[in-house]
Structure formats: structure tokens, C-alpha cells
Amino acid sequence: MTGLSEPEAARRLRRHGPNRLREKEPEPLWEELLEGLAEPMILLLLGTGALYALWGEPGDAATILVVIVALVAVEVTGERRAERAVAALRQLSEPTAAVRRDGRVREAPREEVVPGDVVLLESGRRVPADARLLAAHGLAVDESALTGESVPMEKEAGLVAFSGTLVVRGRGEAEVVATGDATELGRLAHRAREARPPPTPLDRAMRELSRSLLVAAIAVSLTVPMVAWLLRDGAVRPLILTGLALAFAMIPEEMPIILALTLALGARRLARRNAIVRRMDAVETLGTLTAIATDKTGTLTENRLEVARLVAPGGEGHLLEAERLRGEAPLRMEFPFDRSRRLATVIVETASGGRVVVKGAPEAVASRATRVLTPSGPEAMSEENREALLAEAEALAQDGLRVLALAEKPAGPGALTRDEAESGLTWLGLIGLHDPPRPEARPALEACRTAGIRVLMVTGDHPKTAAAVARAVGLEPGQILTGAELDGLTDEEVREALEGAAVVARATPEHKLRIVTAWQAAGERVAVTGDGVNDAPALAAADVGIAMGRGGTDVAREASDVVLADDDFATIVRAVVEGRVLFANLRKAVRYYLACKAALAAVVLLSVLLGLSVPFAPVQIIVMELFMDLAASAAFVAEPGESGLMSRPPRDPRARFLDRAMVASIFTAAAGLFLAVSAAYLWSWPRGEAHARTVAFVTWLLGHVALAFSLRREREPFTGRGLATNRVMLAWGLATVAFVLLAVRLPTLRVALKTAPLAAADGAVAVAAVIGGVALVEWAKRRRRIDSPAVAD
């Protein structure tokens, strides 16, 4: 069958709609805005604005209203940005279906499959839609998703394969009869909201930190007004407004948003690098990996097999003819590749009758061969013949070739079992296939070594082939283990054996799972790659399961955390880099966020204890919080990675997020900002309260900008990289400086923000104070570089 034409498929797609189940409609913008207005912090601002209006200050109330609009807009924009990133990732990870259109087979997005399409089914793929089988060859389907019955159902031509069920063996062709909600799966689907994913370890840590800081923030926002009232016995109304503004500025409501946005945008960056994240917690786990178990074919090599050598005792013509028959002769029966047998068998029809053609590992074929084809015809296979043939296979493997053996025998008219088909064979010869190493594999493996990440190549190939390929990509094989050797070891012995090995040959997916669990028991954080149905347990068990996007099965992709669009090992390394960059940026954002809040509390508390007015009007505190939130939730997320990030050992995810080094750096940053603002405020106090407050306000905002640019590098100096390497932060910094100039020069803004005109000398005082404060932060960074040159903050 030629299948549908592309124009006809497009018409049917318009008529029947996409091949997907009906999803919950996205929330309209007005509902998101209402939810934003219902946030506790926004309600607190609304209450503050209402008090301003009630107490006869409509200008301040209007200013707070503008800030509320800006904050809600920022929050909704950030959430939509994260949702768009996640939706784009979901679309990238959507499975495809093999369809025949215009006489050609191509991969099409599953959503574009339409009634009338001819789809090709094979082991490891899900059935894309309800489809009536046109042909079936040993086809068995797992229908447990529909029926709950775990025993695979044998399928023949004429029967229906249902959408969402899994092909566990064999292959077939089918014509689609129903898609989307019209399928059996669509009729059974419940109208249920999608379950929320469980919180990640980092998410839990951030929420616990937020709860702890919430208590401190409430204490500060209540204590400061009370102490001020007791010491000064002043008017109550300004103190109430100051307390509300402090509560708004101090409560760490942005931290969960910072985490969600960081993870979502980090996942989008990974997608640009061909690593499609299916589970968001994988983004944070990638940066903690200590070990990677990787496939060879297609990951370290190009998966571009070229025939390099032929070894045929009876002549190459017989060998090539058998391979041609496998692909071109009419197929009577097929036994797909079996990992335990390491054989794939077909029974084809030829002019002279049926023939069994077997392809597989040399030792597996040799053990089932009773004869060998020689120039004079078939001869009995002696033990000496068998050893000589396997020695030839080993010689090819030693040259780094992937070696396959071919054998055949006549087939009678009746059906054969697999055991019958794969016994009494005549050995035809060997095919040596060359799979070129990926040029980027060697530097990627070197990067792993530098980063403290162990790499183990796990392959089904001959040990000699595996060792040659390992050396070609720069992976010194050391002791070469085989799957058979692992079978004879206890779990403890497996862990010990893996210590000195970089290659496991003749391995099965079951061996992959043992390797993963053995490493995890030893405290390693493990990534594993896989593409087959049987790889799913190892992919699910690993800390990060990585499936192949090109040749991988649906089952492997569904069990994985990350899908590689290009099947390239170097992409895994790039993903690890992104994971480390993401966590480093999250720490920077939180460090900046907490330092600013601590500095604000210290500045306000000092002024109260000295018997002075609070340095900031309530409306100024609210505006300052807006600028700080923008930097923490957007600018730091866009920060590129620091040099030397992959020279550090992997992060331990069990370590406290707010560790001693980070607390020390937060204290230093807060001290720098506190000293700058306090010095400028006290210096300007003799010229009047309004003047001093304005200088403090200007110093605070300029200090914010300088501190952000200093903290964007944990170890490098302020001037270590150009300011334009982070365009988001540069734009935010320029906007903040422009706002400062307008706030002291534009009469309308001066009234709204309670600022006074400043002379150039006042600006110089603010700038000098900021330089002094940032100098303290830079001095502390320099001390860390000297004391621990190779350790992350």
C-alpha cells in the first residue's frame, strides 16, 4: 500500500483534528491576573494603599496601585514564560509514528496521524491510534493500559491494535480507523485534572528556607515599628505603614517563583542543546552526577555502519547473497533480534524454496552451526573449524570492527519454531562493520574526567571491539568486564569490579540495571543511556535516565528523564554543564535576594536604635522591592556559566543549600550594602530628613545594581567579564539607573516617591558609598579565591 498522500492527510487532519485526547483549556489571562491579585503579598499592598487613601494621601495610594500593577504583570509574565518553556519541551518530547504516505515511510508527529493512515508497528513502539492490522509478523501487544491484563496479546491481520498499547515483539502494518477522543483510550479517559508532580529535593529545601525566613521577616516588620514607637513616641500612622511596607519587602515570597523560573528556563536552554527534559527534577540532578553508564553505538560512535571486511570460507558471493535475501526476498516468518540469544532470524521464499537466514554474534551463530560452507561446498563443522572461525572474528574485533556472523539452511513448507529455525545451520562467514567514533566524543570524555565524573561504556559488542573503540575515543579501558563475569559476582563484588573498569562488553539491559544499582549503593549519582524496551528498568532506576531520540523506542523515552535529540554523548556533557550553571545561578539569585533583605533590616534597625527616622518612606520600600524581585527572578537566571565550573567536583545534593560558605557570603554582601546606605544616610542627615532619605534611597538602588553585578560571579572579580555578557542584567541595571535619575529630577516622581532634589555632590556621596560597599564584597571574593582556589562557594 502507498498510504495517503500528504495533501489528503492534511485535509483529514483539518476534518478530524489532532490525534490527542482533549486537554484542560489553558487558564485565560483575566483569571491569572485575578489569581495574582489574590496573592498574600499583593493583598498586603492593597491594604497599605487602602490605608493611605483612608488617611488622606491619595497620591501615595495611586503610587502603590501602579506598583501593584507592575508586580502582578511581572509575576504573570514570569509564570507564562515558564509555562511556555515547559509546553515547548512537552511538544519536543512528543513521540512520533512511522507512517506510509505517498509510498514512502516517514516519521510523523503522533498528533498528525489521521484516519486512513498506514502505520508501521514494531517492538518498543506504542500504537499511535486505533488501527486495523493489514499484516502481522510475530506481533504481540501489551494492552494493560486499557484492560489491566499484563499478558501480551498475540495479534493477527484483521484484528485491531488500540491506541496507547505497546508492541512488545514482532512487527506489523495497520490502517488507522480512529484517532484522538474517538479511540478506545479516548472513550475510557476520565475527565481528571493532571496530577501535580511531587516537589523536588531542591524545591523542598527552598520552601523550608522560605518558611524559616518568613518567621524572621514577620519578627523584623513587627519589631522595628514597636521599637521606634517606644524610643521616639512618634505618630502611630507612619509606623503602621512602615511596618506593612517592611513586611512586604522582607517576606521571601519570591523564592519558589525564582526556583520554578530557573528550572523551566534551564530546561529550555537544555532543549536548545538537544537535551529534552521530560521531568523537571532532572534539570537540578544533572549537575550532581558522579557517574555515567553510556552505550557505545550512536552515542560514542556515529552509528554509521560501513562494511570494512568480509571473511567467507566459501566465497564472498554467498555471504552477500544471504544478506540480500534478508532484505529483499518475500518474507514468510520473522524472529526479531533477541538479546539473550543474540540472533535475528528470517524465513524467506526463493525460487528454489524456503530458506532460513540467521544473523548475530559469531559465538551464538557458531554454537548453532553444524556445517561450514567451503569453496568445495558444505562440510561438517569440526571443533577445530569452530575455533578457527571464532579466532577470525576476534581478529576483526581487535581492529575495532563490529562483527556479525551469517548462517543459513533450507526451510520446508511448514511453520518452524524459533529453536527449529536456529539449529542445524550452515556457516557462511563474517561481516566486519566499522562505526566511526564521534569526533566530539574524546573532548567530552576528557571534560567528564576533569569534572570528576566516571564514565563506563556498556555495550553488547565483543570485548576486543569494545576495547578498541574505547581507546579510539580516549577512554582507557583498563580492566574489561563482560556481562557473563558480572553474572557470577555478588552485588558487593560488582561494585569492587567496577572500580577498575571503564568497559563492560557483551552486556545486556539487565547488566545495565545491576551496574546502576551497584553504583547507587556505593553513593554514586548515576546517569544511564538506553534505547530499547529492555533498557526501561535501568533508565527508571538511574538518577537520570537518558533515552535516545533518534533510534530510541517509545518505552525507553517514557522511562527516561531526558531525551537526546541527537543521540550524542557530548550532549550529555553539555547537559551536565547546564545543570551546574543552573544551580550556580540559583545560588547567586538567592544570595543576592537574602543579602538585600538582610541589609534592609539592618539599615532600618540601626536608624531606629539611633533615634532617627526610618531611612525610607513606605512607598520607597515597596518600589525598592520591585526592582530587587526583577533582578532575582530574571537577571540571574540569564547568567552564563563561570569559567572553571567543570573543573570542580560534583555537588552533593544532600548538602545544605544554605551552607556555611553561602551564609558567610550573604553576610558579607549584606554588610557591604548596609554600610554603604547607612554611611550615606548618616552623612546626609544634618541637611534634613527628606534630603537624607533621598540620598539613602539613591544609594540603595545604585547599591542594588552594583551588588548584583558583583554577585553574578561567585569567584571572578567584578570586572572579570564584560558587563554585556548578561544582557538581561545589563538592561535591568541601566533601567534602574535611569529610574534613579528620574526619581530625583522629575517633579511628578519626586512627589510620588517622597524624594528631594539632589546636587551633584550628593550623587558623588551615594556613588562613593556604593563603591566602598562593593569593595568589601570584592575583597571577600578575593580572599575566597586565595583560600580555596579550586572549590565552589
Q: Which residues are covered by each model-predicted region?
A:
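Membrane-embedded transport module
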Residues: V224, L263, P477-A527, A542-E716
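Helix-interface capping motifs at the ends of transmembrane segments in multi-pass membrane proteins
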Residues: L43-T63, A216-I251, A264, R268-N274, ...
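Conserved catalytic phosphorylation-site environment of P-type ATPases
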Residues: Q91, P95-R100, L166, E254-E321, ...
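Cytosolic catalytic regions of ATP/NTP-dependent phosphoryl-transfer enzymes
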Residues: F162-T165, T285-T426, L433, E446-A447, ...
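Cytosolic catalytic regions of P-type ion-transporting ATPases
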Residues: A62-V66, E94-R207, G488-L498, A502, ...
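Transmembrane helix-loop-helix hairpins at the membrane interface
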Residues: P18-A98, V105-R106, V151, E208, ...
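Actuator/coupling domain of P-type ATPases
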Residues: T2-G3, R15-L21, L71-A73, T77-Q91, ...
